[in-house]
C-alpha cells in the first residue's frame, strides 16, 4: 500500500536509511538535477527579461485578494511572486540582497545571474567540472571589476550634472521617464539635503527622504519640501491654517484630564460641590493650555488625543494643533524640527522646542472628498525632506514612487562611493571585451568558463 514520504530511523548498523515513497514519485540525481536547477533559473530570468531596458514593457500583477499593480520594477515583481522551486527561491534571495544593498538594479542582476546559469548548464553538459566552472567565473569577475574601476569617474556631492545623469539613467524605462529631467533635479536636491559627512565620508540616509502621494495634479507638479507633509484634517475650523516662522512642540502623551490608575468615586451632595468640581477641572484644562501658550510655541503636534477645550483655547491664541497623529509621524516632526518628544506638559522648556519656517494647510478635492493637507516647511536645517508626488492615485502613484525610489538610491550610492560610470550598456560591453581578451591568454579548461 503506497504511503507518504517517510524514513526509517538509523539503527546503528551503518546501513543507509530506506525511504518509502509513493509509486508515482520520480527520483532524479546527478546531471539531471543540475539541469532542472538551471532550467528553473533560466525561467526566472525570462520572467523579467521583457521588462528590461528602455523598451521594456510593464507587467500587470494580480493578487487573489483583488489587488492589482502595473510595474516593470524587478524588486516589486519578485516580491509579489509565490516561489516554491529551490533554485527560484535562491534568485528571490539574490533580488532581496541587491535591493537591500543598492536599492535598484534587481532586474539586471536577475537576468545576468540567469544567463550565467544558462551558460553553466551548457558547460556542465560538456562534462566541465563544477569547480573549474566556478574558478572561471571568479576569474571573469575579477577582470570585470578591474575594467569597471578603470573606466569609472569620480563624483562629488555638488556635481549636479553627473548626479542628475545617474538619476536619469535609473528612471529610464519607468513610468516617470517622461519628466525625468525635472524629477532628476528634485532627487539630487533631496540627496544633497540629507547627506551628512562622517569621518571624511559622505553618508546618505535615504530613509530621511519621505515620499508623499498627493493623488491629484500632474507628475510635473511634484515638488520638494524641506520638511514633512501630513494628510490629515484639522479638528477645528478656527485653527490657523497659515503660520510664519516659530516654535513647535511635540507631545507623546494625551492633552486632557489625567485619568487615575484605579477606580475612584466622588460623592457630590450639593450643587456647590458640583460647581467646585467642574471649576477645578476647568482650571486644570486652562493651566495646561496656558503652559503651552507661555512656551511660545505656535504649532502643537500630539500623538494622542487633545481635549477640545484645550484646543479651543490654543486656537484663540493663534496656535495650530494637529492631534491623534501616529507615533511615527510625531517622531518625524521631532527629527525634522529638532524638537524633543515630551510626555508631560510640565516638561516644556526652551530645549524641548523645535523650529520651523512656515506652515500652511491646503484643502483640495480628491476621490475621497475634500481633504486637508498640512505642509510643514523647516528649511535647510530640517532633518527630513519630502518629495510630494503628484499625478494620479492608486497603482499609478505607487509606480511613480517606485521609480523615484530607484533614482534616489542610485544617486545616494554614487555620492557615498564617490564613483560613477557610463550607462547604456557601456560597462557591459567593455567588460565583455576585456573578459574575452583575458580568456585568450588562458590555456586550460578554465578558459571555457571565462
PLM segments and residue spans:
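Core, soluble structural subunits of large cytosolic macromolecular machines
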Residues: 1-450
Amino acid at each position: 500500500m503506497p504511503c507518504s514520504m517517510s524514513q526509517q530511523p538509523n539503527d546503528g548498523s551503518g546501513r543507509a536509511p530506506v525511504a518509502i515513497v509513493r509509486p508515482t514519485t520520480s527520483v532524479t540525481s546527478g546531471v539531471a538535477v543540475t539541469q532542472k536547477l538551471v532550467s528553473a533559473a533560466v525561467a526566472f530570468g525570462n520572467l523579467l527579461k521583457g521588462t528590461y531596458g528602455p523598451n521594456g514593457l510593464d507587467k500587470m500583477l494580480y493578487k487573489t485578494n483583488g489587488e492589482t499593480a502595473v510595474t516593470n520594477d524587478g524588486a516589486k515583481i519578485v516580491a509579489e511572486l509565490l516561489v516554491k522551486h529551490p533554485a527560484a527561491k535562491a534568485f528571490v534571495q539574490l533580488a532581496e540582497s541587491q535591493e537591500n544593498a543598492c536599492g535598484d538594479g534587481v532586474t539586471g542582476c536577475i537576468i545576468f545571474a540567469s544567463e550565467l546559469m544558462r551558460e553553466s548548464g551548457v558547460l556542465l553538459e560538456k562534462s566541465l567540472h563544477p569547480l573549474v566552472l566556478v574558478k572561471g567565473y571568479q576569474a571573469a569577475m575579477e577582470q570585470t571589476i578591474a575594467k569597471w574601476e578603470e573606466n569609472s569617474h569620480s563624483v562629488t556631492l555638488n556635481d549636479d550634472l553627473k548626479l542628475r545623469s545617474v538619476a536619469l539613467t535609473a528612471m529610464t524605462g519607468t513610468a516617470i521617464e517622461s519628466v525625468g529631467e525635472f524629477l532628476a533635479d528634485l532627487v539630487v536636491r533631496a540627496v544633497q539635503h540629507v547627506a551628512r559627512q562622517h569621518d571624511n565620508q559622505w553618508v546618505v540616509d535615504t530613509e530621511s527622504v519621505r515620499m508623499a502621494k498627493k493623488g491629484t495634479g500632474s507628475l510635473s507638479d511634484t515638488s520638494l519640501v524641506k520638511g514633512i507633509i501630513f494628510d490629515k484634517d484639522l479638528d477645528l475650523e478656527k485653527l490657523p491654517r497659515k503660520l510664519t516662522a516659530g516654535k513647535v512642540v511635540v507631545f507623546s502623551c494625551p492633552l486632557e484630564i489625567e485619568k487615575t490608575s484605579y477606580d475612584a468615586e466622588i460623592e457630590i451632595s450639593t450643587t456647590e460641590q458640583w460647581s467646585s468640581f467642574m471649576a477645578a477641572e476647568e482650571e486644570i484644562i486652562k493651566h495646561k493650555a496656558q503652559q503651552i501658550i507661555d512656551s511660545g510655541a505656535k504649532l502643537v503636534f500630539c500623538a494622542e488625543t487633545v481635549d477640545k477645550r484645550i484646543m479651543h483655547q490654543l486656537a484663540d491664541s493663534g496656535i495650530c494643533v494637529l492631534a491623534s497623529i501616529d507615533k511615527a509621524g510625531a517622531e518625524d516632526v521631532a527629527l525634522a524640527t529638532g524638537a524633543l518628544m515630551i510626555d508631560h506638559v510640565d516638561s516644556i522648556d526652551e530645549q524641548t522646542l523645535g523650529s520651523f519656517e512656515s506652515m500652511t494647510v491646503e484643502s483640495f478635492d480628491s476621490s475621497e472628498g475634500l481633504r486637508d493637507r498640512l505642509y510643514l516647511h523647516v528649511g535647510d536645517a530640517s532633518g527630513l525632506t519630502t518629495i510630494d508626488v503628484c499625478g494620479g492615485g492608486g497603482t499609478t502613484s505607487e509606480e511613480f514612487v517606485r521609480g523615484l525610489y530607484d533614482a534616489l538610491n542610485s544617486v545616494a550610492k554614487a555620492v557615498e562611493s564617490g564613483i560613477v560610470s557610463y550607462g547604456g550598456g557601456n560597462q557591459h560591453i567593455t567588460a565583455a571585451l576585456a573578459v574575452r581578451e583575458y580568456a585568450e591568454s588562458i590555456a586550460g579548461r578554465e578558459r571555457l568558463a571565462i
